[in-house]
Curated annotation (Swiss-Prot):
This is Nuclear hormone receptor family member nhr-7. Orphan nuclear receptor. It comes from Caenorhabditis elegans. SMART domains: ZnF_C4. Residues 439-465 have a biased composition (Polar residues). The keyword DNA-binding applies. It comes from the Eukaryota. One of its GO terms (molecular function) is zinc ion binding.
Amino acid sequence: MQSYTNRICAVCGDTPAKIHYGVLACFGCKGFFRRAVKDGRNKYVCRFEKNCEVTKFERNACRYCRFRKCLLVGMNPDYVRPDREKSKKGKTVLSKKKSVSRSLSYRLADPSDWTSFLSPSSRKQLSEIGKLAETCSTSTNFDGIGNFSLKSLIADRSLARKTGDSEAMDCSNSPRQLNEQFLGIERIVQCVDYIDRFLVMLEEEHCRKFSVEDKSALISDTMIHLLLFESTSRFVAKGAPGLEDLKLSLAQLPICTTHLTQKIADVFETYLRKPPSIIEYSVLKAYIVLSAESTVLSNSLNESLSLARENLSELLFKVIKHSRNKTSISAANSLSTILHFVYESRNLASRIRQSQQPFFVRDSDPKIPFHKILTDIINPEVSDLLLTTANCRKLSTQMGSSLSSVPPVPPPSDTVPLFHFSPPSLSPCQISAPPPPQQQYTDYSQMPSTSSYPANSSPFQSPYRPNSLSSFPKIPLEMTKSIEEFLRPNGMTTDEMNKPLEKNWADGFRLTPVFNKDIVSQFFPELSNINQHHPF
């Protein structure tokens, strides 16, 4: 069989050649034969004697002789399909019409109604998140929560929403500005309300209930991040001069944060490079809540936050793509820039929180209003088992060093007889030492205490005990009843309850049928000889 490179065209002798229209032909002769059958069957004329030589160098000199040779070598005109190209052209024209109609429908649609490209579930989620971001509390009197902790504040705000005592209003168009303080109580209460409402939405979506401890841990971990995000968004509207306003806002904290100036500038420049729109701002605010540290939350809340974070990332990508009319690649680049800002600002928020922890020490006297709430946010209560164990070890080490001042009891020598030590007596009279013990059992509970035991030691300190027990008599062991004897009914003998099996237990007619004799012998070879003498 000839190889692929050695196959020669039967018409002109060119290589390589394949089977076209029934014979080996090159691609040039194949195309020429198809065009000749379709158009030039009666149009070609030879200028010479109709005997031209057709080679790969002169095959284009005479089309009449080339077409005749194609027919002579056996190329079949019936194999040519003239309608094949028409069907291809029809498909391309139809696809072009569909693409044009699709592009025209996109252009004729309302540009503001880009949410029509989202799924119903995505539109519902976007609407709920937008309502959370636009809703704020109308209360301005916070004197009643001055001594509240963070958990008490969460419970109070939840109860106020259920009873209708706290009304909500649209803050998207409200001219009233929040307190300029970074840790103002009004801003903190609004963040608590936002996170609590967001968790209620997750509870309805995942059919779960989150505890107050989980809510408190989530608020403590994301509060500084949310406040930093809101401040940056407000000051970015002023442009580059807004950076100085942001620095002044952070400089009002109890402990100065000037060492974070460069980090603040980097985060501000990242946000200023591609500021999000209003809708993207609401989605991004919810994403910050979902980016909490997983080590401080329960497993159920971590699972719910992880699922919601995946859905929200996909929703944020769709919002960027359709609202800004971008391609998928451009939308992915914008999303990466926004998420980079989220994690850079989270790093800055954690450093701000660490810098303020020395001022907000737990179990300390209140120095500023709402000190307990701020302490629970900046320096929350740690319930980690490892940290708790480390603190217990540290405390025990300190107690051991304080007890080391008590003079130790000297060990007994060989000449001093061993005797029992009882706890120190509370009587002020002097008590003499007891006589040495004898080699028989003595009631030591009635023995008085000795004056050699240090009287200034703690009554809870264990007395010195000898290492040798040779002076004490051994107590004989008494066999107790077995559990079978306790469970045996009255009047039943031992043989009836626990009768041991005999060696020929497998030979009994009632225990082993005749047809199981061989099976028993396979499992118990030592009984195979015995079974021969005891027929069933």
